[in-house]
Amino acid sequence: MEKVPMTVAGYQTLDEELKRLKTVERPAVIAAIAEARSHGDLSENAEYHAAKERQGWIEGQIAEIEDKIARAQVIDVTKLSGKQVKFGATVSVVDEDTEEEARYQIVGDHEADVKSGRISLSSPLSRAMIGKEVGEVVEVNTPGGVKAYEILKVEWL
């Protein structure tokens, strides 16, 4: 089984979602199915079919999260250090064309949220930065052409 790197926060988020699905959503949908069954004929019971569909979705989510947790390689980024960019690093960069600065934390695929400044380890920018240090320039192929970014700072937050 291939291990997937994940931050402590990412693991906790998954674990909380799994608990919510198992303790809140699953019992609620089971109750909805029982209620719909009590209405009689199941062949034309839209409430029953909707609840069964929701149950299938919930069970799929539970299985998916359990798989992610089983494959998780949880990394506490606050215990990491070094000058090189690697998983968990918070990296400040400047776009060499626009002089626009940005700051990203490199996280696992399911944790990525660009709006929150978290980019996936498998993203083109992350792949370009891995192993690089402050002062180095990385080039990233984008739909609009090649973009160059200078690494300004590497932090472990």
From Swiss-Prot:
Any Pfam family: GreA_GreB
Keyword DNA-binding: yes
UniProt keyword terms in alphabetical order: DNA-binding, Transcription, Transcription regulation
GO terms of biological process kind: DNA-templated transcription elongation; regulation of DNA-templated transcription elongation
Coiled coil region boundaries: none
Transport listed as a keyword: no
GO molecular function terms listed in the Swiss-Prot or TrEMBL record: DNA binding; RNA polymerase binding
Family: Belongs to the GreA/GreB family.
Its biological purpose: Necessary for efficient RNA polymerase transcription elongation past template-encoded arresting sites. The arresting sites in DNA have the property of trapping a certain fraction of elongating RNA polymerases that pass through, resulting in locked ternary complexes. Cleavage of the nascent transcript by cleavage factors such as GreA or GreB allows the resumption of elongation from the new 3'terminus. GreA releases sequences of 2 to 3 nucleotides.
Protein name: Transcription elongation factor GreA
Organism ancestry: Bacteria, Pseudomonadati, Pseudomonadota, Alphaproteobacteria, Caulobacterales
